[in-house]
Regions:
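Disulfide-stabilized extracellular ectodomain repeats and their linkers
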Residues: 38-40, 64, 81, 135, ...
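N-terminal activation segment of mature serine protease catalytic domains
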Residues: 22-46
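C-terminal subregion of chymotrypsin/trypsin-like serine protease catalytic domains
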Residues: 2-20, 56-69, 173-176, 208-255
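Acidic glycine-/aspartate-rich tracts in secreted/extracellular proteins
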Residues: 21, 66-69, 87-92, 126-131, ...
């Protein structure tokens, strides 16, 4: 058993027991500018924000599977209980509210497997979003960024440990680790794990409500946020699902 605590971003689910602690305030998470993150959406269940996500076409969103999965398995909550807010940097207002018509959880996802493995779901929208300056799909990256690359992520998660969700979309930067360093630091072996570590002493990282947050490099979607380690703002690497490992699966549905 690993001496590392993995916390799902949607719920404070303790998967491995370790020392608990409260991380520092994530002051370097900055407010997103209007139109700067046109791919980012808020996934809402019964009208309440649960996760982030990214538009990958005008009627498909990608997010983390554990955001929609019942008990960590292949069955999802009813699609009609969800909608997405697209085209707004405000969690509670603006943009376009579009209900879901279908939820597709990755066929190899199971929360009983290694944390974050295959933790992806595709969400089909009932109607296409209206594309404009604030609402645009993002292209999928074709290869994993080199170690040390600086990626940005955007989400509505808490800006500090035990805080409430942010009203406005926030952005921050992290550096990617090599696959081998990522696996060693988190005691995990799955190939689709991508780790982002603090930039210098910048503790801006994932927190509750950030699951499904898109990680971007060179204007392309590289990964989807899956879990954080040791409490948000701990300064430990965050776990993402590398979407470049799942392009074939995504392209089966998204055209």
């Amino acid at each position: 058993m690993s001496p590392v605590q993995f916390l799902q971003l949607l719920l404070p689910l303790l998967l491995v027991v370790v020392t608990l602690g409260v991380g520092p305030t994530q002051a370097s998470r900055l407010p997103a500018e209007v139109g700067s993150q046109p791919h980012s959406v808020s996934l809402r269940r019964n009208g309440v924000h649960v996760c982030g996500g990214a538009l990958v076409s005008d009627n498909w969103v990608i997010t983390a599977a554990h955001c929609v999965s019942i008990s960590g398995g292949q069955q999802s909550y009813p699609a009609q209980s969800y909608n997405v807010r697209a085209g707004s940097i405000q969690r509670l207002a603006g943009g376009q509210l579009v209900p879901l018509s279908q939820i597709i959880i990755h066929q190899n996802y199971s929360s009983s497997e290694a944390a974050g493995a295959n933790d992806l779901a595709l969400l089909q929208l009932q109607t296409k979003v209206t594309l404009n300056a604030n609402t645009k799909p993002i292209d999928l990256a074709t290869e994993r960024p080199a170690a040390g690359s600086q990626l940005s992520f955007s989400g509505w998660g808490s800006s500090q440990a035990e805080g409430s969700f942010s009203h406005g979309l926030q952005v921050a930067s992290r550096q990617s680790l090599s696959a081998s360093d990522c696996q060693k630091q988190l005691f995990l072996e799955q190939e689709d794990l991508l780790c982002l570590s603090p930039v210098a002493e910048d503790y801006a990282g994932l927190c509750s409500g950030d699951a499904g947050a898109p990680a971007i490099y060179n204007g392309q979607l590289v990964a989807i946020a899956a879990f954080f380690v040791g409490g948000c703002g701990s300064g430990q690497p965050d776990g993402y699902v590398d979407v470049t490992q799942h392009r074939e699966w995504i392209n089966e549905y998204v055209n």
